[in-house]
A protein has these predicted regions:
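Short, motif-level signal for alpha-helix interfacial/capping segments enriched in acidic residues
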Residues: 1-7, 114-116
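Non-heme Fe(II)/2-oxoglutarate
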Residues: 3, 9-106
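Catalytic core of non-heme Fe(II) oxygenases with the double-stranded beta-helix
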Residues: 84-99, 103-160
């Protein structure tokens, strides 16, 4: 349980510019390889301009409602689902770890929320240089968001 070990021993709390946490080394090397090998389109090859969202299809949420394939956004991210979990065995283990009582209680204590009736939605995203994300609340049911960055090429940690 790599994530839980990191939550217990490698977590820093920050209050500026808002309360957030930094968890160091929450993934195994195998999981990192699985993420870096995921087949996701590189947005630089799609001739798209970053607009502060991951939608990248020129429309807001209302524009995309009813588009079952997610529009262009779907091509630039990959959700780990029951149907494709065999392609992501290590990320599937991470989902199970996030669903474990020990982990969701630990995270809940950090953020001050009861996560006992929550769901995990894990996606692999190909954010590239120049990407930025507006603060947002995309669905009211969302209790928290977390982002784990994989930096295999020693890019600057000050990019965003």
């Amino acid at each position: 349980m790599e994530l839980f070990k990191s939550l217990e021993t490698k977590t820093k709390n920050f209050n500026d510019p808002f309360q957030h946490f930094e968890i160091n080394k929450p993934l195994t090397e195998e999981t990192i390889k699985e993420i870096s090998n995921a087949e996701i389109a590189d947005p630089r090859n799609e001739n798209l301009k970053y607009d502060g969202t991951r939608a990248l299809d020129g429309g807001d949420g209302a524009f995309r409602s009813g588009i079952k394939d997610g529009g262009k956004a779907k091509k630039l991210r990959c959700y780990v689902t029951k149907e494709n979990s065999n392609q992501f065995p290590n990320l599937t283990k991470l989902i199970e770890e996030l669903r474990s009582e020990k982990v969701y209680k630990k995270i809940g204590s950090l953020i001050g929320k009861n996560l006992s009736n929550s769901y995990v939605r894990l996606e692999v995203i190909c954010d590239r240089e120049g990407f930025w994300l507006k603060p947002h609340c995309d669905i009211k049911e969302k209790l928290m968001s977390s982002i784990i960055f994989i930096n295999l090429h020693n890019e600057s940690k000050n990019l965003g």
